[in-house]
UniProtKB/Swiss-Prot annotation:
The gene is xseA. GO terms for molecular function: exodeoxyribonuclease VII activity; nucleic acid binding. HAMAP family: Exonuc_7_L (MF_00378). This is Exodeoxyribonuclease 7 large subunit. One of its GO terms (cellular component) is exodeoxyribonuclease VII complex. Bidirectionally degrades single-stranded DNA into large acid-insoluble oligonucleotides, which are then degraded further into small acid-soluble oligonucleotides. PANTHER family: EXODEOXYRIBONUCLEASE 7 LARGE SUBUNIT. Belongs to the XseA family.
Length: 544
């Protein structure tokens, strides 16, 4: 410590017998004291515990350094605060470097701090523990904040020093495992400005948008090599820890060696023991992925083949259990063919009979006979000279003309209606044959000048015949036959049983009626004597 001498020592000397002692003003004594203190303590280092720390709106910081016996007021000007590598906190033991100055307005003295550092590793550990607990209480280290890393990031952002083995190890390991595009944000990783620079880099990566000139990374790696606690201290700073916790991109922290742990590791989504390990955690091994895909492809093909084979076997089993469609429909097809043939024969017979009747009546309605009869009647009427008779003849002739006209219209209507009915039946039952026969009938009718009364009667008869044929066709339907009391016999496999011999070979038979089915068991009837004179079966009447 520098020695000093007080020029105003005569102030302390006893006054002599005379009264010529000089009187100093307060300002003079305060100024003399200020010069003495500032000259004697212009550069000193003071160790103590911080208390009463506050930061004014101007940026200046005010605090006090204390020990067990004394308290020293101190101040840190705004320009010095930005150069301090940590945030001062109450209870922190520090070593302050600066100068003493006095404040004459209140007869106080204070230490103007120009440099501030933590006093020893123990104090650093205590500060680290307090900071860790504070940030943990805020939830920055909660497990639910951790995000899963992307499986195969296309772009990886690295925040580290551009020079050194760290970035080389990361790039080399990524190239070996799975080549990936890497963007390096160069920052200092040690010193007073390291924490702020690294935090700015993390926030800069998070601020990138899709489509920017610099592509947005899918994953961030904050990396630094090993070192002492003081060397790694920037990664314990609150500004950096908060930047990592608030990052919108998943972050891997790879600071120091495996035994080194920083607050950045707690805030990151994943901690890697070394920068090389961070590269291994960031990307998978490409060769392992290829082998895995090949294995999955092989397993998928085998599974598809097994499933196809199993489905084919099941389909074949179902096909064997299903009855044959042709065998199911054979009885109905045969019955339909029989009924169709019978209906065709019946229609042919009816048409032949109708043709004979038509020829018979057509012979009686010859135009020559009609003309001769009309001539005779006209001659007879002409012979009558009575005016009244002539008027009657004229009136009757008019009535006859009206009736004739109406009969012609009715004849045409009935003929059209019959034509439609015949066309409908022709479409159902051999259209070509019916059309030929109908054409013959039409030509024959057109060749004859028929009486309207006879034509109308014939048309009525034909209409009845057609209606009767239609009813016969309906009665020939299989469902109509069942409704009359008949039943269709089938075995357990839905096969038709058509004789008694086959029925005896089955244990159960299915009797199908028009309104349902009944399962029965055939039994052998007891032997009985034949009737001497069995009744003859009644003659089957024709529906036609």
């Amino acid at each position: 410590m520098n020695s000093f001498s007080f020029d105003g020592s005569d102030l302390l000397a006893k006054s002599d017998a005379t009264d010529n002692v000089r009187a100093f003003s307060v300002s003079e004594i305060s100024g003399a004291l200020k010069r003495t203190v500032e000259d004697a303590f212009s550069h000193i280092r003071v160790r103590g515990e911080i208390s009463g720390f506050t930061q004014a709106g101007s940026g200046h910081c005010y605090l006090a350094l204390k020990d067990d016996k004394a308290v020293l007021d101190s101040v840190i000007w705004r320009g010095v605060v930005s150069r301090i590598s940590f945030r001062p906190e109450n209870g922190m033991e520090v070593i302050a470097t600066g100068r003493l100055t006095t404040y004459a307005g209140r007869s106080r003295y204070q230490l103007v701090i120009e440099q501030l550092e933590i006093a020893g590793q123990g104090a650093l550990m205590a500060l680290l523990d307090r900071r860790r607990r504070m940030l943990a209480e805020e939830g920055l280290f909660n497990a639910d904040r951790k995000r899963a890393l992307p499986f195969m990031p296309k772009i990886i952002g690295v925040v580290s020093s551009p020079s050194g083995a760290v970035i080389r190890d990361i790039l080399h390991r990524l190239a070996d495992r799975c080549p990936t595009h890497v963007i390096l944000w160069p920052v200092p990783v040690q010193g007073d400005q390291a924490a702020a620079k690294v935090a700015a880099a993390v926030r800069g990566f998070s601020a990138l948008k899709a489509g920017d000139a610099i592509p947005r990374p899918d994953l961030l790696i904050v990396a630094r090599g090993g070192g002492s606690l003081e060397d790694l201290w920037p990664f314990n700073e609150e500004i950096l820890v908060r930047a990592v916790a608030e990052s919108s991109i998943p972050v891997i922290s790879a600071v120091g060696h495996e035994t080194d742990t920083t607050l950045c590791d707690y805030a990151a989504d994943l901690r890697a023991p070394t920068p090389t390990a961070a590269a291994e955690l960031a990307v998978p091994v490409r060769s392992e992925l290829v082998n895995g895909l090949n294995n999955l492809h092989l397993r998928m093909n085998n599974a598809i083949a097994r499933h196809a084979k199993l489905s084919e076997e099941r389909l074949e089993a179902v096909r064997r259990r299903l009855p044959d469609g042709e065998r199911l429909l054979a009885p109905f097809i045969q019955l339909f063919d029989d009924r169709a043939s019978q209906l065709e024969r019946d229609i042919s017979e009816r048409m032949t009979h109708a043709r004979h009747k038509l020829n018979f009546y057509a012979a009686t309605l010859r135009p020559a006979l009609l003309q001769a009869r009309i001539a005779r009647e006209q001659a007879r009427l002409s012979a009558c000279r009575l005016p009244t008779g002539q008027r009657l003849v004229i009136q009757e002739q008019q009535k006859l003309d009206n009736v004739t006209r109406r009969l012609k219209q009715a004849y045409q209507q009935r003929l059209s209606h019959a034509d439609l009915r015949f066309k409908f039946l022709a479409e159902k039952l051999q259209p070509l044959l019916l059309e030929q026969r109908w054409q013959q009938k039409a030509e024959l009718l057109a060749a004859c000048s028929l009486k309207p009364e006879l034509v109308t009667a014939r048309l009525n008869i034909w209409q009845k015949n057609i209606d009767q044929l239609w009813r016969v066709a309906e009665q020939a339907h299989p469902d109509k036959i069942l409704a009359k009391g008949y039943a269709r016999v089938e075995d357990s496999h839905s096969h038709v049983v058509s004789n008694a011999h086959d029925a005896k070979t089955h244990k159960r038979l299915n009797l199908i009626f028009h309104d349902g089915s009944v399962w029965v068991a055939p039994e052998t009837p007891p032997k009985s004597r034949k009737a001497d004179n069995p009744p003859e079966p009644p003659e089957q009447t024709s529906f036609l």
